[in-house]
Swiss-Prot record:
Keywords: Lyase, Pyridoxal phosphate, Schiff base. Catalyzes the formation of pyridoxal 5'-phosphate from ribose 5-phosphate (RBP), glyceraldehyde 3-phosphate (G3P) and ammonia. The ammonia is provided by the PdxT subunit. Can also use ribulose 5-phosphate and dihydroxyacetone phosphate as substrates, resulting from enzyme-catalyzed isomerization of RBP and G3P, respectively. It comes from Sulfolobus acidocaldarius (strain ATCC 33909 / DSM 639 / JCM 8929 / NBRC 15157 / NCIMB 11770). GO terms for biological process: amino acid metabolic process; pyridoxal phosphate biosynthetic process; pyridoxine biosynthetic process. D-ribose 5-phosphate binds at residues 64, 193, 254, 275-276. GO terms for molecular function: pyridoxal 5'-phosphate synthase (glutamine hydrolysing) activity. In the presence of PdxT, forms a dodecamer of heterodimers. This is Pyridoxal 5'-phosphate synthase subunit PdxS. CDD domains: pdxS. The keyword Lyase applies. D-glyceraldehyde 3-phosphate binds at residue 205. The keyword Disulfide bond does not apply. Pathway: Cofactor biosynthesis; pyridoxal 5'-phosphate biosynthesis. InterPro entries: Aldolase_TIM, PdxS/SNZ, PdxS/SNZ_N, RibuloseP-bd_barrel.
């Protein structure tokens, strides 16, 4: 039996227990216990620890940063975590060449300067960039299509690591394959570095539609879907039981305004990644606070309105129309 299969049985058991607990709470009318006050912390690197960490980020905003100053702005604005890169996605597009993991010295400086979790990106399939970040002590690794893939065919086997991973996905099949590989969090790919939320919207809607379709299928057709997605049938059944992905699903790719963040939360996102939208704008301090406010209060249009008033549209990053991008310029097609 492969390591993937052995590890998957652990996660399957864990999430079925969560599903059963959810049913019990619903049936009895009991209030759920706040996850922010765990009675016993799970051991580092266990399935429970790796999948519990992203749950604590739910409802929050994670911001891309390239230096300590930006990280401090993000923390002061109320971000739940930061993602350290060498360049913001917009600059990755403009500079061309090979985009790699950020300088470990910069990541370490950020870790020593703020109190919120610090994440960092690695290239798809780059096992040793991930090992370096794990040794550095980051809180989560993003195996990201924004960076130049090291392996065009395979992703990292994330079960071998103690640190949790996040991966991008455009649809249910991509999401389930990444979960089967050991991802602890999924995010929409969107089209990073564009300031254009349309692709993130499309990917979230595709995910929602494919989940609802899967739920309505008879068992025989769900078996076919498992083969199509190249994942165990038990993982497909877990999605059906939970009526959602079994792990946290954030929105990312082109989010630039408070209204963008609220829109993605309304579509069912568990939280928000903001890349170039904050620090390629001319009002990063206010915009960071406004996006956090809108994401946390997306159900209240009046508060989202106040958040939108905190920024100026003429200070927003210059967006890119997706239709003007050549096929080879699309980042979302990397890593399927």
């Amino acid at each position: 039996m492969r390591l993937y299969d052995l590890s998957f049985y652990e996660i399957e058991k864990f999430f079925y227990k969560l599903a059963e607990l959810k049913d019990i709470i619903s049936d009895t009318g009991l209030l759920s216990i706040s996850p922010s006050i765990p009675q016993t912390l799970p051991a580092q690197g266990t399935v429970m620890a790796k999948h519990a960490f992203p749950i604590f980020q739910k409802g929050g905003v994670i911001m891309d940063v390239t230096n300590v100053t930006q990280a401090e702005i993000a923390e002061n604005a109320g971000a739940v975590a930061v993602m350290v890169l060498d360049k913001l996605p917009y600059d990755v597009r403009k500079s061309g060449g090979v985009a790699r993991m950020a300088d470990p010295k910069i990541i370490e400086e950020v870790m020593n300067s703020i109190t919120i979790p610090v994440m960092a990106k690695v290239r798809i399939g780059h096992y040793y960039e991930a090992r370096v970040l794990e040794a550095l002590g980051v809180d989560m690794i993003d195996e990201s299509e924004v960076l130049t893939p090291a392996d065009e065919e395979h992703h990292i086997n994330k079960w071998e690591f103690k640190v949790p991973f996040v991966n991008g996905a455009r649809n249910l099949g991509e999401a389930l394959r990444r979960i089967y590989e050991g991802a602890s969090m999924i995010r929409t790919k969107g089209e990073a570095g564009t300031g254009n939320v349309s692709e993130a919207v499309k990917h979230m809607k595709i995910m929602n539609y494919e989940i609802s379709t899967l739920i309505s299928l008879p068992e025989e057709d769900r078996l076919k879907k498992a083969r199509e997605y190249q994942v165990p049938y038990q993982l497909v059944e877990l999605v059906v039981k939970l009526k959602r992905l079994p792990i946290v699903n954030f929105a990312a790719g082109g989010i630039a305004t408070p209204a963008d963040a609220a829109l993605m939360m309304w579509l069912g996102s568990d939280g928000i990644f903001v890349g170039s939208g904050i620090f390629k704008s001319q009002d990063p301090d206010q915009r960071a606070k406004a996006v956090v406010l809108a994401a946390a209060n997306w159900e209240d249009p009046e508060i989202v309105l106040e958040a939108q008033k905190m920024i100026s549209e003429n200070k927003s990053m210059m967006g890119i129309d997706i239709k003007t991008l050549k096929p080879e310029e699309l980042l979302q097609v990397r890593g399927v």
